[in-house]
Swiss-Prot record:
GO BP of this protein: response to antibiotic
Function noted in UniProt: Together with two further proteins McbE and McbG this protein causes immunity to the peptide antibiotic microcin B17, which inhibits DNA replication in enterobacteriaceae. Immunity is determined by two different mechanisms. McbE is involved in the production of extracellular MccB17 and, in a complex with mcbf it also serves as 'pump' for the export of active MccB17 from the cytoplasm to the periplasmic space.
Gene label: mcbF
Organism: Escherichia coli
Family named by the database record: Belongs to the ABC transporter superfamily.
UniProt-recorded name of the protein: Protein McbF
């Protein structure tokens, strides 16, 4: 029996004693090599859960077992800040530096993972300063380089990875993520974009009412809740969560 990469049991957390809990008796398990989503409306606690996983929050009840070292975790926050004076190709240099890679080693990995469309896209922006390209372009570049070059990582935590990224480049990014999970990497990503969980049979956790439920895919999500259309059911779940915050 394999040991889960991440295991959380009966976790409860509140930012302050007199505030309602963000999580109440939350449990989840993530295995090595999984691509798994985290669905929930803003602010359902997706970012807070990621902060807990990476050790940014410690005042919780319950158990959180990380069966990986700090160097085996790569986390992408929702907001990315880069110096505007950097050229986009220098982002590659920074990631090489953090991962102790030579440019030759990096390009070997990039050539192995990227298809022609990636190189066409990269060539268009690589000499530009980061302030001259869109937020989505910067995000696409950083994620593409991170998942390609962070070879020691076992778990990637991606908080809303495709926010601001055009649909065609979003699809390229998911193809790349599928490649690294096929190689045994684990990707746990948060999203509130419905379609990102319907294009493939992607398992996901649903955050609702301060707790969490796991579904094997969107069909399981529908069948478990006796609904006939995906969007109607999702809206019902998120509506329950939203109205509870108003009471």
């Amino acid at each position: 029996m394999t040991i889960p990469l991440l295991e959380i049991n009966s976790l409860s957390f509140s930012y302050k004693v007199n505030l309602p809990p963000v999580f109440n008796n939350l449990s989840l398990k993530i295995e090595q090599g999984e691509l798994i989503g985290l669905l929930g409306e803003n602010p359902a606690g997706k970012t807070t859960l990621f902060n807990l996983i990476r050790g940014g929050v410690s005042n919780y009840e319950g158990t959180l077992k990380r069966n990986f070292s700090g160097g085996e975790l790569v986390s992408l926050p929702q907001v990315i800040n880069l110096s505007g004076t950097l050229r986009n190709e220098e982002v590659l240099d920074l990631i090489c530096c953090f991962n102790k890679l030579t440019k030759k080693q990096a390009w070997t990995d990039v050539n192995h993972k990227w298809n022609d469309n990636f190189f066409i896209r990269y060539d268009k922006i690589r000499r530009k300063r980061t302030y001259t390209v869109s937020y989505g372009e910067k995000r696409w570049l950083i994620i593409s380089l991170m998942v390609t070059l962070c070879k020691n990582a076992r778990l990637f935590l991606l908080d809303e990875p495709t926010v601001g990224i055009d649909i065609q480049y979003r699809m390229m990014l998911w193809e790349l993520i599928n490649k690294i999970t096929a190689d045994g990497k684990t990707v746990f990503f948060s999203t509130h974009i419905f379609d990102e969980l319907t294009r493939d049979k992607i398992p996901f956790y649903m955050l609702s009412k301060n707790s969490i439920n796991r579904y094997s895919d969107m069909s399981d999500f529908i069948q478990s809740n006796n609904e006939t259309t995906q969007k109607r059911h999702l809206l019902k779940k998120l509506w329950e969560q939203e109205t509870d915050t108003w009471i």
